[in-house]
């Protein structure tokens, strides 16, 4: 709808993350930053280390209504971003249960050139929820 000056504004945004297997954690934080004004997006917990809190950048749009669509193909970083927007009461989340990958893996290259991944930590949403195995 145009405002009184004739400018058009978004009535709302639908962020469709169905079938999104995740990707880079930084991109999840960048995406959440578009809709948040700073504050925690995710906490990374690693055995034997202090938890690392990762925050959104300041200045995101906190007013435009936001809905996030998810399904069983929504995983990893896509779940992290969704969890942040949900826990921070910034978005309505709809669809079906997500994949439930809230663990962090690091690869170790073996002497024969192959690699194996080890789980080294987990992600927690701003409310302290683990998504691992839950979605």
Which ranges hold each PLM region?
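Short, glycine-/small-residue-enriched flexible loop/hinge segments at domain edges that mediate gating
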Residues: 10-23
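Flexible glycine-/small-residue-rich
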Residues: 17, 70, 120-122, 135
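Short, well-structured beta-strand/strand-turn elements
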Residues: 88-101
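Conserved functional hotspot residues or short segments at active or partner-binding sites
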Residues: 115, 129-135
């Amino acid at each position: 709808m145009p405002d009184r000056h004739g400018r058009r504004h978004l009535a709302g945004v639908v962020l469709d993350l169905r079938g999104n297997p995740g990707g880079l954690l930084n991109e999840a934080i960048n995406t959440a930053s578009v809709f948040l004004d700073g504050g925690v997006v995710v906490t990374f917990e690693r055995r034997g280390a202090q938890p690392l809190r990762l925050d959104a950048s300041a200045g995101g749009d906190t007013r435009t209504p936001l809905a996030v669509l998810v399904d069983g193909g929504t995983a990893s970083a896509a779940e992290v971003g969704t969890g942040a927007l949900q826990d921070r009461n910034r978005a309505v989340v709809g669809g079906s249960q997500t994949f439930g990958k809230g663990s962090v893996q690091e690869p170790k290259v073996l002497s024969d050139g192959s690699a194996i991944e080890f789980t080294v930590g987990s992600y927690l949403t701003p409310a302290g929820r683990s998504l691992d195995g839950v979605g």
